Design a protein with these regions (language model features):
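Short Gly/Thr/Asp-enriched flexible loops that form oxyanion-binding sites at enzyme active sites
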Residues: 64, 149-159, 405-409
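Short functional linear segments
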Residues: 1-53, 60, 66, 70-71
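ATP-dependent carboxylate-amine ligase catalytic core
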Residues: 22-29, 34-44, 70-156
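Active-site-proximal loop/hinge segments that shape catalytic or ion-binding/gating pockets
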Residues: 398
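Nucleotide phosphate-binding/pyrophosphate-handling subdomain across enzymes
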Residues: 45, 134, 139-144, 152-162, ...
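Conserved catalytic-core segment of NTP-binding enzymes
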Residues: 148-150, 157-216
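C-terminal helical cap/extension that packs against the catalytic core
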Residues: 198-220, 291-294, 334-392
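Hydrophobic alpha-helical packing residues
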Residues: 64-69, 132, 254, 363, ...
Length: 409
């Protein structure tokens, strides 16, 4: 099998949440536990840091990985979803897993996998953990896929757990209140393993304290610590300030655990995060005139901060190219759109996309003037054609809109 034949096989044979949604979601860990047994317990073969949260867990994971890389540690990084290439999910020192390793893993385990009814995410976790163990990483930063308690990554016993914040997202799976969602994400808190909470919230603080007490897990609230200033970083989204604070507090705690992380390593980790880890799609400027920015924010909380930052920018016209998936509360998101923005609606190229006719109806219900397009590239082209040098074009609403955009760049 070639690499592309391998991916075609996996996409066709294994249910993938990012593409099809609920049909691929499993509410238990048994398949992952069975997979780890088949692979001879790779999750026990490397040290790790486990990162959950509604927003910011991807950026935080990349920042922590970058700091460890600057300190000279061989650093694994597992994140999801990918934007362009599946291998973005699995990296060591910023380098994607080789294509032949992916193909080799699938070919050698294909028969066993077919009997286990694995999801795409379970399979990718198995590949990542097997790869990190075989390559003898010093540490792996592992981002939760969704939730925490029942996420496939939750077979780890890490050095440190991080929960960035709790908001309303994936409520059909994790619960319809912030408290219920916090309960799910708190499932990554392990016996005697310290946990850093990025944001203390009235509805969740008691839940985290109760569970950490039950687990004898030291708990640190990052926003109770106020750094004089943050290190320089190419990550310019206003929402990153909370992630910076969470990362700094986590790094300081890891230093106390004995990891050789100096202030210089931390500072350089922030400054070189994009270069070290190839993080993309976080308030990423793709063009200067007119300015084109993309961001993977995809829920009300994340897009509220994005819209505020766009509104504050000096500009002539604001052009918004937006598309969504079909399991988000899009009506609430559409209320955030500035009334003076020029709106281009589109449909990302995945089965889980919110169909353009439904999005057009929702926008009309909100009295939003708009034009609509069947794909992201056409919407972006229209925005570019209508713009002058002093305008700002923002592309987002979904990770998969950004993925479609970047795949053409």
């Amino acid at each position: 099998m070639t690499y592309h034949e391998t991916l075609d096989y996996l996409y066709q044979q294994l249910p993938m949440y990012q593409r099809i949604g609920k049909a691929a979601y499993k509410a238990d860990l048994q398949s992952t536990i069975d997979l780890m047994k088949l692979l001879d317990a790779p999750e026990k073969g490397f040290k790790s840091i486990h990162v959950a949260g509604t927003n910011g867990k991807g950026s935080t994971s990349h920042l922590v990985a970058s700091i460890f890389q600057e300190a000279g540690y061989k650093t694994g990084l597992y994140t999801s979803p990918h934007l362009i290439d599946f291998r973005e999910r699995i990296k060591i020192n910023g380098e994607m897993i080789p294509e032949e390793r992916v193909t080799q893993f699938v070919e050698s385990k294909k028969a066993a996998f077919s009997e286990m009814d694995l999801s795409f995410f379970e399979w990718s976790v198995g590949l990542a953990f097997d790869y990190f163990r075989s390559e003898s990483v010093d540490i792996a930063i592992v981002e939760v896929g969704m939730g925490g308690r029942l996420d496939s990554t939750n077979v780890l016993t890490p050095e440190l757990s991080i929960i960035t914040n709790i908001g309303s997202d994936h409520s059909q799976y994790l619960g319809d209140t912030v408290g219920k969602i916090a309960q799910e994400k708190a499932g990554i808190i392990k016996k005697n393993v310290p946990v850093v909470i990025g944001r203390s919230q009235r509805e969740t603080e008691g839940i985290f304290r109760k569970i950490s007490l039950h687990q004898d897990a030291p708990i640190i609230f990052a926003d109770h610590h106020f750094p004089d200033e943050f290190p320089r970083s190419p990550l310019k989204g206003n929402y990153q300030k909370e992630n910076f604070q969470t990362t700094l507090v986590a790094a300081q705690h890891l230093k106390q655990q004995g990891w050789n992380l100096t202030e210089e390593h931390i500072s350089n980790g922030f400054e070189n995060v994009v270069k070290n880890t190839n993080l993309r799609g976080r308030w990423e400027t793709l063009q200067e005139s007119p300015k084109v920015i993309c961001d993977v924010a995809h829920n009300v909380e994340g897009l509220t901060i994005i819209m505020d930052q766009l509104q504050a920018m000096p500009r002539h016209e604001l052009h918004l190219v937006l598309g969504f998936v079909n399991d988000k509360n899009v009506s609430d998101i559409l209320t955030l759109i500035p009334k003076d923005a020029i709106l281009y609606l589109c449909e990302p190229s995945i089965p889980r996309a919110l169909r353009i006719d439904k999005l057009v109806q929702l926008a009309s219900d909100c009295d939003l003037k708009h034009t609509s397009y069947n794909d992201v590239a056409s919407a972006v082209d229209a925005a570019q054609s209508a713009s002058i040098a002093q305008d700002v074009i923002f592309v987002g609403g979904s990770t998969f809109v950004v993925a479609d955009l970047l795949s053409t760049k």
